[in-house]
Amino acid sequence: MNFLAAAIAAGLAAFAASYGNGKVISKTIESMARQPELSAQLRSTMFIGVGLIEAVPILSIVVSFLILFS
């Protein structure tokens, strides 16, 4: 049962992070197309947002390992 719980936790976190990253990147590209003069500022903000979104699956993997090995 622990294997199933760990797999579900990691899988849902990976799915949610990939969906969130896709939305952030698509909206950033859309904004860059509308206002090219802000592309540098938008790009740096996008990288910060993607980094924060990627923290969730990393924490989920840690929780999955705790579920598996405890």
Swiss-Prot record:
The chain crosses the membrane at residues 1-21, 47-67. F(1)F(0) ATP synthase produces ATP from ADP in the presence of a proton or sodium gradient. F-type ATPases consist of two structural domains, F(1) containing the extramembraneous catalytic core and F(0) containing the membrane proton channel, linked together by a central stalk and a peripheral stalk. During catalysis, ATP synthesis in the catalytic domain of F(1) is coupled via a rotary mechanism of the central stalk subunits to proton translocation. Key component of the F(0) channel; it plays a direct role in translocation across the membrane. A homomeric c-ring of between 10-14 subunits forms the central stalk rotor element with the F(1) delta and epsilon subunits. The keyword Membrane applies. This is ATP synthase subunit c. SUPFAM superfamilies: F1F0 ATP synthase subunit C. F-type ATPases have 2 components, F(1) - the catalytic core - and F(0) - the membrane proton channel. F(1) has five subunits: alpha(3), beta(3), gamma(1), delta(1), epsilon(1). F(0) has three main subunits: a(1), b(2) and c(10-14). The alpha and beta chains form an alternating ring which encloses part of the gamma chain. F(1) is attached to F(0) by a central stalk formed by the gamma and epsilon chains, while a peripheral stalk is formed by the delta and b chains. It comes from Latilactobacillus sakei subsp. sakei (strain 23K). It is a multi-pass membrane protein. Keywords: ATP synthesis, Cell membrane, CF(0), Hydrogen ion transport, Ion transport, Lipid-binding, Membrane, Transmembrane, Transmembrane helix, Transport. It is found in: Cell membrane. GO terms for molecular function: lipid binding; proton-transporting ATP synthase activity, rotational mechanism. The record marks E54 as: Reversibly protonated during proton transport. It holds the Pfam family ATP-synt_C. The keyword Transmembrane helix applies. Its main location: membrane. Belongs to the ATPase C chain family. GO terms for cellular component: plasma membrane; proton-transporting ATP synthase complex; proton-transporting two-sector ATPase complex, proton-transporting domain.
